[in-house]
């Protein structure tokens, strides 16, 4: 009988990179084809949210695998440290560089050398937003999948201030999810999730991988700009009022 400890813990790095990047390219091609056929914006958006759903499942299953021989983590701060130090390197080759929190459910994760952006040519403004946006869906879904496994739901706001840096604002919902990890949300929990979703977000195709991701461009041409500003303001205020050693956790590269 095969036990979990005998399962392989890694795959070929090049194969994983090709797979993940090709997922993004496939979604972009599908979206472009729909756009040529004059499909609705909702149909085009669903192609990219497919990436978020895949990232959600990857994050959830990797977390479940690594938690087999660990004590249960319950605090949100410990969850985010576990994500930054142990889970992120599995998919993106290196730990996250910086983790900040206001101790009130808002975390700012910074990767100053995001692997997917390292080969991109330097660009700014609208051009950079158009190129980088599709690559945020998978990691944003990955973060939500990890958080979900620990019994929480969260909204993720992703942005690229400059290449190859990327920043993720993670805002935990006030009430933890009642659905046990690995099981689809019930109708009751689905209704709770809907109440925490931004007003302009679309209805997801699945309840357990519902979209909580907002993508922020450097030109601020986004429909959910107010929410992003609110999260950043809260994080900045907390950083100014609390001791830096309590609010900032610099992670080893």
Curated annotation (Swiss-Prot):
The keyword Phosphoprotein applies. GO terms for cellular component: cis-Golgi network; trans-Golgi network; TRAPP complex; TRAPPI protein complex; TRAPPII protein complex; TRAPPIII protein complex. Coiled coil: none annotated. It comes from Schizosaccharomyces pombe (strain 972 / ATCC 24843) (Fission yeast). PANTHER family: GEO08327P1 (PTHR12817:SF0), TRAFFICKING PROTEIN PARTICLE COMPLEX SUBUNIT 6B (PTHR12817). One of its GO terms (biological process) is macroautophagy. The keyword Phosphoprotein applies. Residues 175-253 are annotated as: Disordered. Keywords: Phosphoprotein. Belongs to the TRAPP small subunits family. BET3 subfamily. Residues 175-184, 215-242 have a biased composition (Polar residues). The modification Phosphoserine is found at residue 180. This is Uncharacterized protein C13G6.05c. Residues 185-196, 203-214 have a biased composition (Low complexity).
